[in-house]
Amino acid sequence: MPARAQVSEAILLAEGQKSAVTEYYLNHGKWPENNDSAGVASASTIKGKYVQSVTVANGVVTAQMKSDGVNKEIKGKKLSLWAKRQDGSVKWFCGQPVKRDNADDPNDAVKDDADANGKISTKHLP
């Protein structure tokens, strides 16, 4: 199966956490620190045929692909969804794995996740 089709599962599973993360932010004024505070299942429970886990960390939702049974170009690699405040609403982004050091960063700053086990090439992102 093409890597792009397998990556779409990761995006779908990660997107499933967006409403909980957004709701937490709107209620608390900061991003949820982890899956539990976001009110979603544990990272290892949010999985699929090709996805090993989906983690919420300081409002960044990161999906990690499995290390076997997936296209070799994406084995064990990650992608992230993250939000920023914009004009009174929350705008979401998707791409390479990132992290946010502080759940209540006033600038919603994110940076490349240097600890990420490889990045999914943009050619595989829908």
What are these regions (language model features)?
Residues 26-126:
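Periplasmic/extracellular, small/polar-rich flexible segments of pilin-like filament-forming proteins
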